[in-house]
Amino acid sequence: QTWLPFV
């Protein structure tokens, strides 16, 4: 997952 602001 690369769409999360903390990921």
From Swiss-Prot:
An example of a Gene Ontology cellular component annotation for this protein is:
extracellular region
**Which positions bear Valine amide?**
7
Listed GO biological process terms: defense response; positive regulation of smooth muscle contraction
Query: Which residues are reported to carry the modification Pyrrolidone carboxylic acid?
Result: 1
Tissue specificity annotation: Expressed by the skin dorsal glands.
KW Transferase (keyword) present:
no
Record's keyword terms, sorted: Amidation, Amphibian defense peptide, Pyrrolidone carboxylic acid, Secreted
Q: Where in the cell is it found?
A: Secreted
UniProt lists the family membership as follows: Belongs to the frog skin active peptide (FSAP) family. Peroniin subfamily.
Q: What does this protein do?
A: Induces contraction of intestinal smooth muscle in isolated guinea pig ileum.
What protein name is recorded for this chain? Peroniin-1.4
